[in-house]
Design a protein with these regions (language model features):
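Active-site-proximal alpha-helical segments within enzyme catalytic domains
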Residues: 136-143, 182-203, 254-269
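A short, well-structured edge-of-sheet supersecondary motif
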Residues: 2-41, 254-265
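Short, charged, amphipathic alpha-helices and their helix-cap/turn boundaries
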Residues: 21-27, 32, 101-130, 150-168
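Active-site SXXK
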Residues: 45-70, 94, 140-144, 194
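Active-site Gly/Thr loop motif
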Residues: 167-169, 212-266, 271-274
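Short, gly/Ser/Thr-rich active-site loops of penicillin-recognizing serine hydrolases
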Residues: 276-292
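Active-site helix/loop module of the DD-peptidase/beta-lactamase fold
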Residues: 64-97, 146-182, 186
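Conserved catalytic neighborhood of penicillin-recognizing serine enzymes
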Residues: 81-107, 119-121, 125-129, 133-138, ...
Length: 292
């Protein structure tokens, strides 16, 4: 039995024991893969995993010379009103949640203002402080759209279609831009392809879709996010942990978990059980590595 199948079976057992509300599971270790379904593989919002997809969009644009991560984001939206300190905020700050701009989450965040990005940038920055917000990713993609046009169309051509992911329909804000920090419906199998691209440092079937350095930056040299394990470091959309692993983590249990040559994809409807499940997955991967 392959390592991927062993890990899959142990995760399935852990889900059964814990009662975690899993929908789908895909395990890739080396060239081996295995999957399991609890529910049909239908389109589901991957929530904040979409932030990682937005990082890939910005990375591809940077590879093409269309945008820079390290110049003030106001260069790309010069007509936007800006708060105190905002002229120092870069695309990298927005995508690492370290802009220092405070805009509290609400259920109606995307519709509370005519243009969320304008509202975000007109507020003051407190310097390089971690402040997790969908508005931060949305503002980054607003800046990107000023250089590449519609970000959804840009991703279709350069990421989704090369991965064999067709007919992607983002949830849109009232002004027509993708919601960016969420609102991306994918199947488990499609999310797993994005996970494999990331695991393989930007390569897909012999073609490099995004430079490896950007993939590394998704989980290396992150900013201090807080005191709690698993939420203490945040890089370009990637959370450090559990353990030696790192992950893209969407609400309600949408997970891409990376450890060495393994990537585990989980879709679910279980917000509060996700942290424990992520830790269990990493423990299972580490045990399998030891041959136990």
């Amino acid at each position: 039995m392959t390592a991927a199948r062993i890990v899959r079976d142990r995760i399935v057992e852990a889900v059964s024991t814990s009662g975690f509300g899993a929908h789908g599971l895909h395990v890739r270790i080396g060239a081996g893969e295995a999957e399991h379904r609890w529910t049909p593989d239908v389109l589901e919002d991957v929530h904040s995993v979409a932030k990682g997809v937005c990082v890939l969009a910005a990375a591809i644009a940077a590879d093409e010379g269309a945008i820079s991560f390290d110049v003030p984001v106001t260069v790309y939206v010069p007509d936007f009103e800006r708060g105190e300190g905002v002229d120092e905020v870069t695309l990298r700050h927005l995508l690492t949640m370290s802009s220092g701009i405070d805009l509290p989450w609400s259920e109606t965040l995307m519709t509370d203002w005519p243009d969320l990005a304008r509202e975000f940038l007109r507020r003051p920055s407190r310097g390089r402080r971690f402040q997790y917000s969908n508005a931060s990713t949305y503002t980054a993609m607003t800046a990107l759209s000023a250089r590449v046009g519609d970000v959804g169309d840009y991703l279709d051509a350069r990421l989704f279609r090369p991965l064999g992911i067709d007919d992607v329909v983002w949830t849109r804000s009232p002004n027509g831009r993708i919601q960016a920090g969420g609102g991306l419906p994918l199947r488990t199998s499609e999310m797993a392809r994005i996970g494999l691209l990331i695991r393989d440092r930007g390569w897909w079937q012999g073609t490099q879709l995004v430079s490896s350095g950007w993939i590394d930056a998704m989980h290396e040299n992150g900013v201090v996010a807080g005191p709690n394990p698993g939420y203490d470091r945040y890089a370009l959309a990637g959370w450090g942990g559990p353990g030696r692993g790192w992950r893209l983590h969407g609400a309600h249990g949408q997970l891409l978990i990376f450890l060495d040559d393994a990537v585990v994809t989980i879709t679910a409807a279980d917000h509060f059980g996700a942290d424990e499940m992520a830790a269990t997955v990493v423990d299972i991967l580490e045990t399998a590595r030891r041959g136990a």
